[in-house]
């Protein structure tokens, strides 16, 4: 649970701000072992270009290099064509597997926008 957003919250760069141009892109694995309770995930997506949409979701795995599956409740709203979107979702880390990644699927052409996902989390022993 996020008790103190000031001094007790840590930022998780699930997907650092990066160009989302074609296909499906996946972020690096984030280890949730040191965190507990709700994690707020914030999506910041800029307009991607005419007809371009971004479908962003969180995926999870028991091992860093394992097979990743969708996190229950971990999908953001798909952006409208050529529209920016900022959105926040909450997922409880106790309900997720140890490792998470972000997945961005670009549809409708070659994107020209940037997409980032940041998590705000509380450590177990802080």
Protein language model annotation of sequence segments:
Residues 1-13, 106-126:
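C-terminal interaction-tip segments
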Residues 1-2, 75-78:
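Intrinsically disordered, low-complexity boundary segments flanking structured domains
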Residues 17, 74, 92-94:
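Compositionally biased, intrinsically disordered low-complexity segments
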Residues 17-34, 46-70, 77-85, 105-112:
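Surface-exposed ligand/attachment interfaces on beta-rich extracellular proteins
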Residues 37-43, 93-111:
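Noncatalytic modules at the cell exterior or secretory-pathway interfaces
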Residues 81-98:
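Aromatic- and Gly/Pro-enriched, solvent-exposed loop/edge beta-strand patches characteristic
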